[in-house]
Amino acid sequence: MNKYLILCVDDEPEVLNSVLQDLAPFEDNFIVEGAESVDEAKQVIQEMGQEGIKLALILCDHIMPDKTGIDFLIELNQHDSTMPTRKLLLTGQAGLEDTVTAINNAALDFYISKPWQGDQLRDTITQQLTDYVIANDKQLLNWTSILDTERILTSMSDKRTSFGE
């Protein structure tokens, strides 16, 4: 089974630790990493990429000192290796204009406002990771016990049906 990376980026250590704690259940099947800056996030992505580990999902704060989360997500969307990545914005400070920019230019997949509920965050991450593996992994059967079983089996059935046509 392919290993994929979930990366959380937030410049506030308490927030980052809280998000990582909420995502701990994913650690059995994904590599879950945190970064306190865009530069640190880029380093993690590069190091994991050198090991053949793809970035499946990034959960990024918007307001950070060196670069906004939206600008970083736009940058990721411009590279072939990270374009398929599911991109989530976790913030309490993005205005309407920033959010529209993220949707239009960064292919934002989901917006989560702070404060968040742990169960809702995990459900959202599960759905986004399901979307990612359906689109990017050929061995879907491996994921049926981990992610959204019904959607994965439906996708497998649809692929078999379209292959036979």
Task: Please give the residue ranges for each predicted region.
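CheY-like receiver
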Residues: 120-165
